[in-house]
């Protein structure tokens, strides 16, 4: 919880610091997003997938669990217990 609070404070400072130097909010927000990310690119990536994406998804096992009961597989211990 402390880490989340710290991250929130840092994000607020990161956004508001340029504003105190005379920047406009819209310019600050645009500065947080890479230039090559556009709504068209986002929509295209949602609807059109490369064939390799579906092959990768079909070979990776999907773990559907609650966080406290079954953490994601990369974080599981080698002995298979919790």
Swiss-Prot record:
Q: What is the tissue specificity?
A: Expressed by the venom duct.
Per UniProt, subcellular location reads as:
Secreted
* Residues modified as 4-hydroxyproline: 71-72, 74
Single annotated GO MF? toxin activity
Signal peptide per UniProt: 1-22
Propeptide regions on this chain: 23-57, 75-82
Q: Which residues carry this modification: D-tryptophan?
A: 67
- What are the record's GO terms for cellular component? extracellular region
**Keyword terms, alphabetized:** D-amino acid, Disulfide bond, G-protein coupled receptor impairing toxin, Hydroxylation, Secreted, Signal, Toxin
Function per UniProt: Moderately activates human somatostatin receptors (SSTR) with a preferential activation of SSTR1 and SSTR4. In vivo, does not cause behavioral changes in mice within a few minutes of intracranial injection, but causes a progressive loss of movement thereafter. Four to five hours after injection, mice recover, even with the highest dose tested. Shows antinociception and antihyperalgesia activities in two mouse models of acute pain, most probably by acting outside the central nervous system.
Domain text from the record? The cysteine framework is C-C.
- Miscellaneous remark of the record: This peptide is an evolutionarily optimized stable analog of somatostatin. In addition, it adopts nearly identical conformations as in the somatostatin drug analog Octreotide. As this drug, it contains a D-Trp at the same position, whose synthesis is a common strategy used for enhancing the metabolic stability of compounds in drug design. Consomatins evolved by gene duplication of a 'Somatostatin and related peptides (SSRP)' gene expressed in the snail neuroendocrine system.
Protein family membership: Belongs to the conotoxin C superfamily. Consomatin family.
The name this protein goes by in its record: Consomatin Mao1
Which organism does this record belong to?
Conus maioensis (Sea snail)
């Amino acid at each position: 919880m402390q880490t989340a609070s710290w991250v929130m404070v840092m994000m607020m400072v990161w956004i508001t610091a340029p504003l105190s130097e005379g920047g406009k909010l819209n310019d600050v927000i645009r500065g947080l997003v890479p230039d090559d990310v556009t709504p068209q690119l986002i929509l295209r990536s949602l609807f059109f997938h490369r064939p390799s994406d579906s092959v990768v998804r079909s070979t990776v096992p999907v773990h559907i669990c609650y966080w406290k009961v079954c953490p994601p597989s990369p974080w599981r211990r080698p002995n298979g217990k919790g």
